[in-house]
Amino acid sequence: MSTLGHQYDNSLVSNAFGFLRLPMNFQPYDSDADWVITGVPFDMATSGRAGGRHGPAAIRQVSTNLAWEHNRFPWNFDMRERLNVVDCGDLVYAFGDAREMSEKLQAHAEKLLAAGKRMLSFGGDHFVTLPLLRAHAKHFGKMALVHFDAHTDTYANGCEFDHGTMFYTAPNEGLIDPNHSVQIGIRTEFDKDNGFTVLDAGQVNDRGVDDIIAQVKQIVGDMPVYLTFDIDCLDPAFAPGTGTPVIGGLTSDRAIKLVRGLKDLNIVGMDVVEVAPAYDQSEITALAAATLALEMLYIQAAKKGE
């Protein structure tokens, strides 16, 4: 079984076209790409509503609505003229085999990073971030984590494959440094003694964006950063199509402004996860995810253009 694919060898979940109508490249390791997009159609680790395996397809589908804008507002340049971005399709694995997915995703990421590429990944449920962190830590060493979510995902329930345990496991494996990591938008129960800085949704909504970004920069410092965005960080009014929605979240406007504010960080890997299109309304969740992913690429392009 191949590692990467498209709708003809993985017809349940993938697309024939790339994110933002970018070129598809199923051999990205030898390409001249700066950033490689990988879909991870996996939702076996979810504790809420299933369907996140269809997230990558939904994000790609709605991203066609974003492809027409060249000098994107408010950046006033075209990201595609500064970054070489390709979409390598979806990870292909035996559906029902969480271990195979994890091992194949980590191996794929390690191969890309060794070839000098950077990764933007689409989940799938949030568990997919753990094998990505393992690969990135092998390449970059211990990292800071900037994590947007309604949940901290630091729960120790003893389950090997669970979308609520990754950031309990990752510090224990030495992948991330919680003392240089920040979790944004949290509005569920969390452990206050694990080293992470938690900026709950209430204070994120009440404080100024510049104030929050200044604090994030101070916490992270100059460490390599992994950026992960669980779409349930947004209020369900803006992102109903997700497995574990929680009211009282961020607006899409505030989330975009916060992501733009991360431009000066040393971001080495990124993902957007937990889009479950079966529960979406008029594709607004997928559109929010696609827009946030595009903004992530724009902050990389902005740095390259400086």
UniProtKB/Swiss-Prot annotation:
The Enzyme Commission number assigned here is: 3.5.3.11
Q: InterPro entries, from UniProt?
A: Agmatinase (IPR023694), Agmatinase-rel (IPR005925), Ureohydrolase (IPR006035), Ureohydrolase_dom_sf (IPR023696), Ureohydrolase_Mn_BS (IPR020855)
Q: Give the enzyme's main class according to its UniProt record, as a single word.
A: hydrolase
- What residues does Mn(2+) bind to? H126, D149, H151, D153, D230, D232
Pathway membership, UniProt: Amine and polyamine biosynthesis; putrescine biosynthesis via agmatine pathway; putrescine from agmatine: step 1/1
GO molecular function list:
agmatinase activity; manganese ion binding
* Alphabetized PROSITE patterns for the sequence: ARGINASE_1, ARGINASE_2
Cofactor(s) this protein cannot do without: Mn(2+)
Function statement: Catalyzes the formation of putrescine from agmatine.
- Which protein family is named in the record? Belongs to the arginase family. Agmatinase subfamily.
Listed name of the protein: Agmatinase
Q: Which organism is it from?
A: Enterobacter sp. (strain 638)
Lineage of origin: Bacteria, Pseudomonadati, Pseudomonadota, Gammaproteobacteria, Enterobacterales
